[in-house]
UniProtKB/Swiss-Prot annotation:
GO terms, biological process: azole transmembrane transport; intracellular monoatomic cation homeostasis; response to xenobiotic stimulus; xenobiotic detoxification by transmembrane export across the plasma membrane
A Pfam match: ABC2_membrane
Location of region: Disordered: 1-29
Record-given protein name: Pleiotropic ABC efflux transporter of multiple drugs CDR1
TM region(s), chain numbering: 510-530, 548-568, 597-617, 622-642, 654-674, 763-783, 1193-1213, 1228-1248, 1278-1298, 1314-1334, 1342-1362, 1466-1486
Positions in coiled-coil regions: none
Activity regulation (record text): Inhibited by clorgyline. Inhibited by RC21v3, a 4-methoxy-2,3,6-trimethylbenzenesulphonyl derivative of the D-octapeptide D-FFKWQRRR, via the interaction with the ectodomain. FK506, enniatin, milbemycin alpha-11, and milbemycin beta-9 also inhibit CDR1 activity. Inhibited by milbemycin A3/A4 oxim derivatives.
Family membership: Belongs to the ABC transporter superfamily.
Disruption of the gene: reported phenotype: Leads to susceptibility to the antifungal azole derivatives in azole-resistant clinical isolates. Suppresses the development of high-frequency azole resistance (HFAR) in a medium containing fluconazole.
Protein task: Pleiotropic ABC efflux transporter that transports and confers resistance to structurally and functionally unrelated compounds including rhodamine 6G, Nile red, caspofungin, cycloheximide, or azoles such as fluconazole, itraconazole, ketoconazole, posaconazole, voriconazole, and isavuconazole.
GO molecular function, one term: ATP binding
NCBIfam families found in the cross-reference section: 3a01205 (TIGR00956)
Length: 1499
């Protein structure tokens, strides 16, 4: 079977199919790159199922033959069974496999599965209306949600729950196809999920019965999950895998034990993959990446085929397809359904398909149909009887309306036609969902259905159940548990997933290479930073040795932090494959870990070898390998920990908060920043549970044990003390013993950290235990954590609007048209709403002053050329046309004909290539104001999710209507637009995101509304306004366009194969064939008669009276799949009388229209309607409102700020003025900056969302300039960062105790104010660097990596880890250019300066004075030389106690910090912020502002 003929397929040339047998019946040969040819073959071959069986009996032996051929020259070779042959026929292959299975039932164990349900009721939590969370109510709303989850509600279950599906019944027997029809929101998706046992997010009532030929949904979920499969709309795949790799993995995981005799597992899997690719037209894409929205790969249509091929390989007996034909035209959708029919007939499988736009030919293939209306089942039965059933009910089917469209139109009050005869005769016609449901339940068809279901449910299925179980066990591999739903064993799952993961790594090897090179570079940079101070193995290296070791363990441990990103990419795929019973999620998790081991080892080897030897750690083989072993344990322990965090989090942003908190806690309590002996009592437990603490301890013992470090500095020192006895001076290092000229490493560790050598291997053992513990925990979480549950669509309103609506008692009448929120609406209110809406639609637009187009827009000989691989390709070829006020013009053509390209050229939206020809407005060239004088409704509905409908419309009106129009007039005009678009019910609803906000139709109306609110004076372009919509919504959008045209608006609209009824709404048609060539431009006429007459008069076959004129025309010109034109209709057009008339009209327009009087004022021709300052004001207000209504973003910013600063503040709580206290205060300032990464990563996605919306919609329509966009981003972010900086200051400054230093120095106010300025400046700096990095980067991850690198380098060279005096001369420039140098210097000096130091008892150096001297006399010369330090008791003669420092300013000098530079430092840091913002603005202009527009080339 084939799927959509997409843009890639469109370029494939078709060849004529010839009959290949005596029955003049062409055989279906599968799919290779000639997709269209094959579509036609399949369509012609499989129309009659009996013919198919007849054909098979003539060509295949009853017992079947082995289809895996090793020799194509052998006598038994059948090319129709060989997927690599051009003659391959998938239908014959399926029949052959069925024959083989039936020939040996004891081995292959064939079986079948049907599905029967009775009294099926689905319920969801009542939430049809929500108030919008904002910065103030966000925490309350979140706590209320948690409370409601934890504490059972006292409300009745009726209040809490509502029925999504009301009581319904159904039966799908083996070999049958069921189509489910209904408008969006009717419950189609919920029904499919219910009968496929995928009920996340809603509940099935206890009284409901669902039977799968005797099995319960619980049996399916636990033991036979793979037999019942639900295929969702979205096509989610691993983007970097090729099509072949994606499908081969599925085939390997589904290869049965009872496969073809004599064929090994791998050969069978490869054959199955080849068959699937040949069947679905994917053979030519085998080595192409599947891709996604960001990764370039196969086309959208081909990706849809990959999804279908996956399900096909799974071989499920009951398949549920949710809108699987979305985005496919009717011809290719037909082929998909035909192939489903063949599969059902031959393999005895059953399928249920929910479909939105269903052609008559497709409908006729279904055995049964189920019609849903707002959760009510209003018909279930034979597809052939449904139309008659509703006609009997009292509804009329218009001429040329398909049966499927008629059945869904019955559920739409605005579209259904009630039989006038019934009304005249007073016969009751059911109209509300409940009335139709009651009519259905009283009908004979319902009674027949109940009889069928009861007979099926009462059947004895014991034999059938045993058959299914035997078949399942026979398919399972040897080591698989019989009760397991999976086909292959756990070990084989890991093996195949490991292969898949290695493919992924190979396909994206650039990432691994970047990590290796990046980490190696960091090893060189960091290692060389310590090179000078670690050159000599003396006591002077003690601090730096600890710092370097701390850096090593942190860098290795946190190198796995970014693994969280990849977890979220793969999660939906794993969840999908779990429902297909391909593998355990834990098997995928374990394979993922194993596959990354080589990359981790290579990265660790490259980093650690370079770093270890450059830093000059201990040169000993055993010591090095122990160092490497400990760091490898750190890598895996943290990798598994971060994976655990990711697996319990619903979203990436939710995972980053705990990950950031862990990062801070683990690093601060590792033993370096604050030694274990100095940790405050209440927080010691953090050290005991911290794996990094034990690993750091082992590394330090490994480095220092059994070493003598020569003393680098003695106290006292100087020429006066050269001849004093050894016990009269001491080494200045901790651990020194009086009289020794060295310090033992073990003594230093014991005194400084309380580390003992006997604990060396303890760290390794505990680290390994953590690795195993986190691994097991991660696998358990992956296996049993269901991930984010899907929500139904709900309308969201701002809280003040909700209050007002409650007062007006409107809430019960407001409902979003969707699947999971339509609750029980009383019959009366339902009728009232129907009546109200019909009254409003009658009145709406009667007296509305919509903008009327006055000018005629016309183009002549329009050509568009682009360079592709050094060749010039013509996309549009001499296209002519016009759009007049009050007309609705359709633009049609096959995929790849250039429809959207023509719109973009006419609207000046192309940024590459060369456009030639004439494009004129009333005979004059387009001016700068043209882009804002038109409305352009894109195919994607792009809106700001936090705005309401009314706010979105007003924003467009304020900025795009002329500045001289008053605000009152603009507001009134917006109200007019709301009325004509019939959006009054949800005018104050928040746009939201799909699922929580407006539904598809409402979004499409808003898209049109935003363009109308701009009051376009020329015309409105609409690109595919009906794509992805059901036929009823498409109809309502088309009616809306007609209404606009009737109000004098000029409209040009591209449309993809409209229905006959839709087609009749248009006035004119411009039809393009492939290559951008015109085939027809002219009136359509009543019932498209003018257009039909044109083609019939120029040699086409007659249009059948019941045919869709659009499909007939596509077939005539050879644009439908498999069709061929009997002549070149472009040449026919160029030689026709109609073409000459078009040329004459265009000539008249060019000559006469310029004579019209037009407004030539300067404001009319400006690029933007309003000034830059006004734009900045409005855009900033909107952005501020967005921030206010995004509590997740703001509260995570403040939560992180509060947590980080409380954590740091209470770790170093009220640090004293001892040496350790000063060290702690310096490290506290250093740790203050680690919030940089988490805050930056939160901001970047927010900016990217804003920018994408601006560049896709607001910039092309000239709503506001790029200057207003970028300046508003800066202006709105700064106040929130200042607020966060203020919160940080209040917590941090007082907790650490900086205020007490200022108080003692009598500088409380100045130093407090300056510290607050530094704190705010740092938070603003984070925002400025984020803007600088993202301004020119396309994706947030790239900007985050760049900013993280810059921050790491700034932090490394800021002077804390290594003082500038200790750095190699080469790196001094880095110290000077690092912005954190000035921040930390300023904060530290402001925090601790001008106070006396008081050493703790253990920090005092003790030694004996020279004979007959007091300590004061003995140390006097030394203290005068060093100018710091104090003696505890100068008069002592026995033991001198000396504190090395006497004043905090002396300590500051030792770390190159000075209090006198405090204001200079703040000023320099502010300059860095200004530089970041200015550079960000410049880089945005340089990289992302278009320097040319799609203007016409000068001739």
């Amino acid at each position: 079977m084939s799927l959509a003929s997409d843009k890639k397929d469109a370029d494939v040339a078709s060849t004529t199919t010839t009959a290949q047998d005596d029955d003049n019946l062409s055989t279906y040969h599968g799919f290779d790159h000639h997709v269209q040819d094959q579509v036609r073959q399949l369509a012609r071959t499989l129309t009659q199922q009996s013919s198919l069986h007849q054909k098979k009996e003539h060509t295949l032996p009853e017992e079947g033959i082995n289809p895996i051929f090793t020799n194509t020259e052998a006598d038994d070779y059948n090319p129709r069974l060989d997927p690599t042959s051009d003659e391959f026929s998938s239908a014959e292959w399926v029949q052959n496999m069925s024959n083989i299975s039936n020939s040996d039932p004891d081995y292959y164990k064939p079986y079948s599965l049907g599905c029967y349900w009775k009294d099926l009721v689905a319920t969801g939590e009542s939430a049809d209306i929500e108030y919008q969370a904002n910065f103030l109510n966000g925490p309350y709303k979140g706590l209320k949600t948690v409370y409601n989850t934890v504490v059972p509600s006292t409300a009745s279950s009726k209040d809490k729950n509502f029925k999504i599906l009301k009581s319904m019944e159904g039966a799908v027997n083996p070999g049958e196809l069921l189509v489910v029809l209904g408008r969006p929101g009717s419950g189609c998706t919920t029904l499919l999920k219910s009968i496929s046992s995928n009920t996340h997010g809603f509940n099935i009532a206890k009284e409901s019965t669902i039977s799968y030929s005797g099995m319960t949904p619980n049996d399916i979920r636990k033991h036979f999950r793979g037999e019942v499969v639900y295929n969702a709309e979205a096509d989610i795949h691993l983007p970097h895998l090729t099509v072949y790799q994606t499908l081969l993995t599925v085939a390997r995981l589904k290869t049965p034990q009872n496969r073809l005799k004599g064929i090994d597992r791998e050969t069978y899997a490869r054959h199955l993959t080849e068959v699937a690719m040949a069947t679905f037209g994917l053979s030519h894409t085998r080595n192409t990446k599947v891709g996604n929205d960001l990764v370039r790969g196969v086309s959208g249509g081909e990706r849809k085929r990959v999804s279908i091929a996956e399900v096909s390989i799974c071989g499920s007996k009951f398949q549920c397809w949710d809108n699987a034909t979305r985005g496919l035209d009717s011809a290719t959708a037909l082929e998909f359904i035909r192939a489903l029919k063949v599969q059902a007939s031959i393999s005895n499988a059953a399928a249920t398909v929910a479909i939105y736009q269903c052609s008559q030919d497709a409908y006729d293939l279904f055995d049964k149909v189920c019609v849903l209306y707002d959760g009510y089942q209003i018909y279930f039965g034979p597809a052939g009887k449904a139309k008659e059933y509703f006609q009997k009910m009292g509804y009329v089917s218009p001429e040329r309306q398909t049966t499927a469209d008629f059945l869904t139109a019955v559920t739409s009050p605005s579209e259904r036609i009630i039989n006038q005869d019934y009304i005249n005769r007073g016969i009751f016609v059911p109209q509300t969902p409940k009335e139709m449901w009651e009519y259905w339940r009283a009908s004979e068809d319902h009674a027949d259905l109940i009889k069928e279901i009861d007979s099926k449910l009462s059947d004895n299925y014991d034999a059938n159940l045993a058959e299914i179980k035997d078949a399942h066990v026979a398919r399972q591999s040897k080591r698989a548990r019989p009760s397991s739903p999976y086909t292959v064993s756990y070990g084989m799952q890991i093996k195949y997933l490991l292969i898949r993961n290695f493919w992924r790594i190979k396909q994206s090897s650039g990432v691994t290479l970047f990590m290796v090179i990046g980490n190696s570079s960091m090893a060189f940079i960091l290692g060389s930073m310590f090179y000078k101070v670690m050159k000599h193995n003396t006591t002077s290296t003690f601090y730096f040795r600890g710092a370097a070791m701390f850096f090593a363990v942190l860098f290795n441990a946190f190198s796995s932090l970014l693994e969280i990103f990849s977890l979220f990419e793969a999660r939906p795929i794993t969840e999908k494959h779990r429902t297909y019973s391909l593998y355990h999620p834990s098997a995928d998790a374990f394979a993922s870990i194993l596959s990354e081991v080589p990359a981790k080892l290579i990265t660790a080897v490259c980093f650690n070898i370079i770093y270890y030897f450059l830093v000059n750690f201990r040169r000993n083989g055993g010591v090095f390998f122990f160092y490497f072993l400990i760091n490898i344990v750190a890598v895996f322990a943290m990798s598994h920990l971060f994976r655990c965090v990711g697996s319990v989090s619903k979203t990436l942003s939710a995972a980053m908060v705990p990950a950031s908190m862990l990062l801070l806690g683990l690093s601060m309590y590792s033993g370096f920043a604050i030694p274990r002996t100095k940790i405050l009592g209440w927080s010691k437990w953090i050290w005991y549970i911290n794996p990094l603490a034990y690993l750091f301890e082992s590394l330090m013992i490994n480095e220092f044990h059994d070493r003598k470090f020569p003393c680098s500095q003695y106290i006292p020192s100087g020429s006066v003390y050269n001849n004093v006895p050894a016990d009269s001076r001491i080494c200045s290092s901790v651990g020194a013993i009086r009289g020794n000229d060295y310090v033992l490493g073990d003594d230093f560790l014991r005194e400084s950290y309380s580390y003992l050598h006997k604990h060396k291997w303890r760290g390794f053992g505990i680290g390994l235990a953590y690795v195993i513990f986190f691994l097991v925990l991660y696998l358990i979480l992956c296996e049993y954590n269901e991930g984010a549950k899907q929500k139904g669509e709900i309308l969201v309103f701002p809280q003040n609007i909700v209050r007002r609506m409650k007062k007006e008692r409107k809430l019960k009448n407001v409902s979003s048209d969707n699947d999971v929120e339509i609750g029980d609406v009383s019959d009366i209110s339902d009728k009232k709403i129907l009546a109200d809406s019909s009254d409003e639609s009658e009145e709406s637009g009667a007296n509305i002053g919509l903008s009327q187009s006055e000018a005629i827009f016309h183009w002549r000989n329009l050509c568009y050329d682009v360079q592709i691989k050094k060749e010039t390709r013509r996309i549009l070829n001499n296209v002519d046309g016009w759009v007049k006020p009050g007309t609705l013009t359709a633009l049609m053509g096959a995929s790849g004909a250039g429809k959207t390209t023509l719109l973009d050229c006419l609207a000046e939206r192309v940024t590459m290539g060369v456009i030639t020809g004439e494009v004129s407005v009333d005979g004059k060239q387009r001016d700068d104001s043209f882009a804002r004088s038109i409305g352009y409704c894109q195919q994607q509905d792009l809106h700001l999710k936090t705005s309401t409908v009314r706010e979105s419309l007003r924003f467009s009106a304020y900025l795009r209507q002329p500045a001289d129009v008053s605000i009152e007039e603009k507001n009134q005009y917006v109200e007019d637009v709301i009325k004509i678009l019939e959006m009054e019910q949800y005018a104050d609803a928040v746009v939201g995101v799909p699922g929580e906000g407006l539904n598809v139709e409402q979004r499409k109306r808003l898209t049109i509304g935003v363009e109308l609110a701009a009051k376009p004076k020329l015309l409105v372009f609409l690109d595919e306004p009906t794509s992805g919509l059901d036929s009823q919504t498409a109809w309502s959008i088309c009616q809306l366009m007609k209404k606009l045209a009737n109000h004098g608006q000029a409209i040009l609209c591209t449309i993809h194969q409209p229905s006959a009824i839709l087609m009749q709404e248009f006035d004119r048609l411009l039809f393009l064939q492939r290559g951008g060539k015109t085939v027809y431009f002219g009136d359509l006429g009543d019932g498209c008669k003018t257009m039909i007459d044109y083609f019939e008069s120029h040699g086409s076959h007659k249009c059948p009276p019941d045919a869709n004129p659009a499909e007939w025309m596509l077939e005539v010109v050879g644009a439908a799949p498999g069709s061929h034109a009997n002549q070149d209709y472009h040449e026919v057009w160029r030689n026709s009388d109609e073409y000459q008339k078009v040329q004459e009209e265009l000539e008249w327009m060019s000559n006469e229209l310029p004579k019209k009087n037009t407004n030539n004022s300067e404001t009319v021709h400006k690029e933007f309607a309003t000034g830059v300052l006004y734009q900045c004001k409005l855009v900033s207000l909107r952005l501020f409102q967005q921030y206010w209504r995004s509590p997740d973003y703001l509260w995570s910013k403040f939560f992180l700020t509060i947590f980080n600063n409380i954590f740091i503040g209470f770790t170093f709580f009220k640090a004293d003025r001892s040496l350790q206290g000063l060290q702690n205060q310096m490290l506290a300032v250093f740790m203050f900056t680690v919030i940089f990464n988490p805050l930056l990563q939160q901001y970047l996605p927010s900016f990217v969302q804003q920018r994408d919306l601006y560049e896709a919609r607001e910039r092309p329509s000239r709503t506001f300039s790029w200057k207003a966009f970028i300046v508003s981003q800066i202006l709105v972010e700064i106040p929130w960062n200042i607020l966060a900086g203020t919160v940080a200051f209040v917590i941090y400054y007082y907790a650490i105790g900086f205020y007490s230093n200022a108080s003692v120095a009598h500088q409380l106010h100045e130093r407090g104010a300056l510290f607050w300025l530094f704190s705010c400046a740092f938070y603003v700096y984070i925002g400025s660097l984020a803007l600088f990095c993202i301004s020119f980067n396309q994706v947030a991850e790239a900007a985050a990596n760049m900013a993280s690198l810059m921050f790491t380098l700034s932090l490394s060279f800021c002077g804390v880890l290594v003082t500038p005096n200790g750095m190699p001369r080469f790196w001094i420039f880095m110290y000077r250019v690092s912005p954190l140098t000035y921040l930390i210097d300023g904060m530290l000096s402001t925090g601790v300066a001008n106070v006396a130091i008081k050493c703790s008892n253990y920090e005092l150096l003790r030694f004996s004075p020279a004979a007959n001297l007091t300590c004061g006399e003995y140390l006097g010369p030394y203290l005068q030389t060093v100018k710091t330090g104090y003696i505890v008791d100068p008069s002592a003669t026995d033991t001198c106690e000396l504190c090395p420092y006497s004043h905090t300013n002396d300590f500051l000098s030792s770390v190159s910090s000075k209090y006198s530079r405090r204001w200079r430092n703040w000023g320099i840091f502010i300059c860095y912020i200004a530089f970041n913002y200015i550079a960000g603005i410049f880089l945005y202009w340089l990289a992302r502002v278009p320097k040319k527009s799609g203007k016409l080339a000068k001739k």
